[in-house]
Swiss-Prot record:
EC number(s) recorded for this UniProt protein: 1.1.1.-
Family named by the database record: Belongs to the short-chain dehydrogenases/reductases (SDR) family.
Molecular function GO terms recorded: oxidoreductase activity
The protein's name in its UniProt record: Tropinone reductase-like 3
Keyword annotations of the record: Oxidoreductase
Domain of life of the organism encoding this protein: Eukaryota
Keyword Thylakoid: no
Active site: 163 (proton acceptor)
Entry function: Has no tropinone reductase activity.
Pfam families, per database record: adh_short_C2 (PF13561)
Residues where substrate binds: 150
The keyword Oxidoreductase is annotated on this UniProt entry: yes
Length: 258
Protein backbone atom coordinates (compact mmCIF):
# COMPACT_ATOMS: atom_id res chain seq x y z
CA UNK A 1 0.00 0.00 0.00
CA UNK A 2 1.47 3.32 -1.07
CA UNK A 3 1.70 5.69 1.84
CA UNK A 4 0.02 9.07 1.95
CA UNK A 5 1.30 11.30 4.72
CA UNK A 6 -1.51 12.19 7.09
CA UNK A 7 0.20 15.54 7.69
CA UNK A 8 -0.11 16.45 4.01
CA UNK A 9 -3.88 16.14 3.67
CA UNK A 10 -6.94 17.77 5.15
CA UNK A 11 -10.25 16.41 6.38
CA UNK A 12 -12.49 17.30 3.43
CA UNK A 13 -14.78 14.32 3.97
CA UNK A 14 -15.37 14.60 7.70
CA UNK A 15 -18.88 13.31 8.45
CA UNK A 16 -19.40 12.02 4.91
CA UNK A 17 -20.13 8.52 3.66
CA UNK A 18 -18.38 7.21 0.55
CA UNK A 19 -19.00 4.03 -1.42
CA UNK A 20 -16.14 2.78 -3.60
CA UNK A 21 -16.69 -0.29 -5.77
CA UNK A 22 -13.94 -2.80 -6.52
CA UNK A 23 -11.96 -1.32 -3.67
CA UNK A 24 -10.03 -4.08 -1.94
CA UNK A 25 -6.84 -3.59 -3.97
CA UNK A 26 -5.20 -1.38 -6.57
CA UNK A 27 -6.70 1.97 -7.51
CA UNK A 28 -10.00 1.29 -5.75
CA UNK A 29 -8.30 0.54 -2.45
CA UNK A 30 -6.12 3.63 -2.76
CA UNK A 31 -9.22 5.77 -3.31
CA UNK A 32 -10.98 4.29 -0.29
CA UNK A 33 -7.84 4.80 1.79
CA UNK A 34 -7.52 8.44 0.74
CA UNK A 35 -11.17 9.26 1.38
CA UNK A 36 -10.95 7.51 4.74
CA UNK A 37 -7.81 9.42 5.74
CA UNK A 38 -9.72 12.60 4.97
CA UNK A 39 -12.49 11.66 7.36
CA UNK A 40 -15.01 9.71 5.32
CA UNK A 41 -16.72 6.57 6.50
CA UNK A 42 -15.85 4.35 3.55
CA UNK A 43 -17.85 1.41 2.25
CA UNK A 44 -15.62 -0.93 0.30
CA UNK A 45 -16.66 -3.86 -1.85
CA UNK A 46 -15.33 -6.76 -3.86
CA UNK A 47 -16.58 -10.07 -5.23
CA UNK A 48 -14.73 -12.14 -2.62
CA UNK A 49 -15.34 -12.08 1.13
CA UNK A 50 -11.67 -12.85 1.85
CA UNK A 51 -10.53 -9.78 -0.07
CA UNK A 52 -13.12 -7.62 1.65
CA UNK A 53 -12.09 -8.82 5.11
CA UNK A 54 -8.39 -8.22 4.44
CA UNK A 55 -8.98 -4.71 3.10
CA UNK A 56 -11.23 -3.82 6.02
CA UNK A 57 -8.51 -4.81 8.48
CA UNK A 58 -5.90 -2.72 6.64
CA UNK A 59 -8.11 0.36 6.68
CA UNK A 60 -9.14 -0.09 10.30
CA UNK A 61 -5.46 -0.31 11.22
CA UNK A 62 -5.12 3.24 9.86
CA UNK A 63 -7.95 4.48 12.06
CA UNK A 64 -10.45 4.63 9.20
CA UNK A 65 -14.16 4.01 9.72
CA UNK A 66 -14.95 1.27 7.20
CA UNK A 67 -17.71 -1.12 6.24
CA UNK A 68 -17.01 -4.04 3.91
CA UNK A 69 -19.68 -5.55 1.66
CA UNK A 70 -19.38 -8.36 -0.86
CA UNK A 71 -20.63 -7.06 -4.19
CA UNK A 72 -20.26 -8.21 -7.77
CA UNK A 73 -21.48 -5.11 -9.58
CA UNK A 74 -23.19 -7.11 -12.32
CA UNK A 75 -25.37 -8.86 -9.72
CA UNK A 76 -28.55 -6.84 -9.13
CA UNK A 77 -29.22 -8.28 -5.66
CA UNK A 78 -25.68 -7.56 -4.53
CA UNK A 79 -25.81 -3.99 -5.91
CA UNK A 80 -29.02 -3.37 -4.00
CA UNK A 81 -27.55 -4.90 -0.87
CA UNK A 82 -24.49 -2.64 -1.13
CA UNK A 83 -26.68 0.46 -1.14
CA UNK A 84 -29.19 -0.82 1.43
CA UNK A 85 -26.47 -1.93 3.85
CA UNK A 86 -24.75 1.45 3.58
CA UNK A 87 -27.94 3.40 4.20
CA UNK A 88 -28.99 1.12 7.04
CA UNK A 89 -25.70 1.74 8.88
CA UNK A 90 -24.97 5.36 8.01
CA UNK A 91 -28.34 6.79 6.95
CA UNK A 92 -27.04 8.51 3.82
CA UNK A 93 -24.58 8.48 0.93
CA UNK A 94 -22.38 11.46 0.02
CA UNK A 95 -19.90 10.02 -2.48
CA UNK A 96 -20.06 7.17 -4.97
CA UNK A 97 -16.93 6.10 -6.82
CA UNK A 98 -17.67 3.58 -9.56
CA UNK A 99 -14.38 1.80 -10.11
CA UNK A 100 -15.28 -1.78 -11.03
CA UNK A 101 -14.04 -2.97 -14.41
CA UNK A 102 -13.15 -6.13 -16.28
CA UNK A 103 -10.96 -6.97 -19.24
CA UNK A 104 -11.24 -10.73 -19.80
CA UNK A 105 -10.05 -10.70 -23.40
CA UNK A 106 -7.14 -9.44 -25.47
CA UNK A 107 -8.81 -10.45 -28.73
CA UNK A 108 -9.39 -8.03 -31.58
CA UNK A 109 -12.88 -6.55 -31.55
CA UNK A 110 -14.02 -8.44 -34.64
CA UNK A 111 -12.82 -11.70 -33.10
CA UNK A 112 -14.34 -11.23 -29.64
CA UNK A 113 -17.19 -13.56 -28.72
CA UNK A 114 -20.58 -11.99 -28.10
CA UNK A 115 -20.69 -13.30 -24.54
CA UNK A 116 -17.38 -11.57 -23.80
CA UNK A 117 -18.54 -8.31 -25.37
CA UNK A 118 -21.65 -8.47 -23.20
CA UNK A 119 -19.65 -9.17 -20.03
CA UNK A 120 -17.25 -6.27 -20.54
CA UNK A 121 -20.09 -3.87 -21.35
CA UNK A 122 -22.18 -5.05 -18.42
CA UNK A 123 -19.45 -4.63 -15.81
CA UNK A 124 -17.69 -1.55 -17.19
CA UNK A 125 -20.68 0.57 -18.21
CA UNK A 126 -24.12 -0.86 -17.48
CA UNK A 127 -23.34 -1.65 -13.84
CA UNK A 128 -22.42 1.98 -13.15
CA UNK A 129 -25.81 3.13 -14.39
CA UNK A 130 -27.70 0.50 -12.41
CA UNK A 131 -25.69 1.18 -9.26
CA UNK A 132 -26.53 4.87 -9.47
CA UNK A 133 -30.19 4.06 -10.02
CA UNK A 134 -30.08 2.37 -6.61
CA UNK A 135 -27.98 5.07 -4.96
CA UNK A 136 -29.64 8.20 -6.36
CA UNK A 137 -32.59 8.35 -3.91
CA UNK A 138 -30.13 8.38 -1.01
CA UNK A 139 -27.61 10.92 -2.28
CA UNK A 140 -27.50 14.10 -0.24
CA UNK A 141 -27.60 17.61 -1.66
CA UNK A 142 -23.99 18.42 -2.55
CA UNK A 143 -23.10 14.79 -3.18
CA UNK A 144 -20.57 13.66 -5.74
CA UNK A 145 -20.20 10.77 -8.17
CA UNK A 146 -16.86 9.88 -9.73
CA UNK A 147 -16.61 7.36 -12.56
CA UNK A 148 -13.24 5.74 -13.20
CA UNK A 149 -12.49 5.58 -16.92
CA UNK A 150 -9.03 5.11 -18.50
CA UNK A 151 -6.54 6.65 -20.87
CA UNK A 152 -7.45 3.73 -23.14
CA UNK A 153 -10.82 5.38 -23.63
CA UNK A 154 -9.14 7.99 -25.81
CA UNK A 155 -7.35 5.53 -28.09
CA UNK A 156 -8.28 1.92 -27.37
CA UNK A 157 -5.20 -0.25 -27.93
CA UNK A 158 -5.54 -3.46 -29.93
CA UNK A 159 -4.92 -5.66 -26.89
CA UNK A 160 -7.60 -3.83 -24.86
CA UNK A 161 -10.01 -2.90 -27.64
CA UNK A 162 -13.43 -3.59 -26.10
CA UNK A 163 -12.20 -2.49 -22.68
CA UNK A 164 -11.11 0.82 -24.21
CA UNK A 165 -14.44 1.23 -25.99
CA UNK A 166 -16.30 0.86 -22.70
CA UNK A 167 -14.01 3.42 -21.11
CA UNK A 168 -14.82 5.81 -23.97
CA UNK A 169 -18.48 5.25 -23.15
CA UNK A 170 -17.87 6.38 -19.57
CA UNK A 171 -16.75 9.78 -20.84
CA UNK A 172 -20.15 10.22 -22.45
CA UNK A 173 -21.94 8.72 -19.47
CA UNK A 174 -20.30 11.34 -17.26
CA UNK A 175 -21.76 14.13 -19.39
CA UNK A 176 -25.23 12.57 -19.48
CA UNK A 177 -25.39 11.87 -15.76
CA UNK A 178 -24.01 15.29 -14.84
CA UNK A 179 -26.94 16.95 -16.57
CA UNK A 180 -29.50 14.49 -15.25
CA UNK A 181 -28.36 14.60 -11.63
CA UNK A 182 -27.79 18.36 -11.44
CA UNK A 183 -28.06 20.64 -9.56
CA UNK A 184 -27.78 18.67 -6.33
CA UNK A 185 -25.29 15.97 -7.37
CA UNK A 186 -22.07 16.47 -9.32
CA UNK A 187 -20.76 13.78 -11.66
CA UNK A 188 -17.17 13.71 -12.87
CA UNK A 189 -14.68 11.21 -14.19
CA UNK A 190 -11.03 10.26 -13.72
CA UNK A 191 -9.17 8.67 -16.63
CA UNK A 192 -6.05 7.02 -15.20
CA UNK A 193 -2.98 6.32 -17.25
CA UNK A 194 -1.24 2.98 -16.88
CA UNK A 195 -0.60 2.02 -13.27
CA UNK A 196 1.33 -1.12 -12.25
CA UNK A 197 -1.46 -2.90 -10.37
CA UNK A 198 -2.61 -6.52 -10.54
CA UNK A 199 -5.20 -5.46 -13.13
CA UNK A 200 -2.54 -4.14 -15.52
CA UNK A 201 0.17 -6.60 -14.58
CA UNK A 202 0.08 -8.43 -17.91
CA UNK A 203 1.25 -5.18 -19.52
CA UNK A 204 3.46 -3.51 -16.94
CA UNK A 205 5.46 -6.63 -16.01
CA UNK A 206 6.85 -6.73 -19.54
CA UNK A 207 9.90 -4.47 -19.48
CA UNK A 208 9.67 -3.48 -23.15
CA UNK A 209 5.97 -2.63 -22.91
CA UNK A 210 6.50 -0.77 -19.65
CA UNK A 211 9.32 1.29 -21.16
CA UNK A 212 7.14 2.08 -24.17
CA UNK A 213 4.29 3.25 -21.95
CA UNK A 214 6.65 5.41 -19.89
CA UNK A 215 8.08 7.00 -23.03
CA UNK A 216 4.60 8.09 -24.11
CA UNK A 217 4.25 10.22 -20.99
CA UNK A 218 5.79 13.65 -20.56
CA UNK A 219 6.83 12.70 -17.03
CA UNK A 220 8.57 9.48 -18.15
CA UNK A 221 6.98 7.29 -15.52
CA UNK A 222 3.87 5.24 -14.93
CA UNK A 223 1.24 6.49 -12.55
CA UNK A 224 0.71 5.34 -8.98
CA UNK A 225 -2.49 4.39 -7.24
CA UNK A 226 -1.93 7.40 -5.00
CA UNK A 227 -1.94 9.69 -8.06
CA UNK A 228 -5.37 8.38 -9.00
CA UNK A 229 -6.69 8.58 -5.47
CA UNK A 230 -5.63 12.22 -5.14
CA UNK A 231 -7.44 13.23 -8.32
CA UNK A 232 -10.55 11.30 -7.32
CA UNK A 233 -10.60 12.85 -3.86
CA UNK A 234 -10.35 16.32 -5.38
CA UNK A 235 -13.29 15.78 -7.71
CA UNK A 236 -15.37 14.22 -4.94
CA UNK A 237 -14.64 17.06 -2.52
CA UNK A 238 -16.17 20.49 -2.10
CA UNK A 239 -12.96 21.91 -3.57
CA UNK A 240 -14.48 20.88 -6.90
CA UNK A 241 -17.95 22.21 -6.09
CA UNK A 242 -18.23 24.08 -9.42
CA UNK A 243 -16.96 21.21 -11.54
CA UNK A 244 -19.37 18.69 -13.06
CA UNK A 245 -19.54 16.69 -16.26
CA UNK A 246 -15.76 16.75 -16.67
CA UNK A 247 -13.03 14.16 -17.06
CA UNK A 248 -9.60 14.63 -15.51
CA UNK A 249 -6.92 12.64 -17.31
CA UNK A 250 -4.25 11.51 -14.85
CA UNK A 251 -1.70 10.06 -17.23
CA UNK A 252 1.48 12.08 -16.99
CA UNK A 253 0.87 13.90 -20.24
CA UNK A 254 0.02 10.88 -22.37
CA UNK A 255 -1.94 12.19 -25.40
CA UNK A 256 -5.66 12.13 -24.64
CA UNK A 257 -7.77 13.56 -27.41
CA UNK A 258 -10.83 11.91 -28.91
Amino acid sequence: MEKTSKKMIGRRFEGKVAIVTASTQGIGFAIAYRLGLEGAAVVISSRKQKNVDEAVEKLKAQGIEVLGVVCHVSNSKQRKNLIDTTVKKYGKIDVVVSNAAANPSTDALLETQESVLDKIWEINVKASILLLQEAAPHLQKGSSVVLISSITGYQPPASMAMYGVTKTALLGLTKALAEEMAPYVRVNCVAPGFVPTNFADYLTRNEDIRNSLEEKTFLKRLGTTQDMASATAFLASDDASYITGETVVVAGGTPSRL
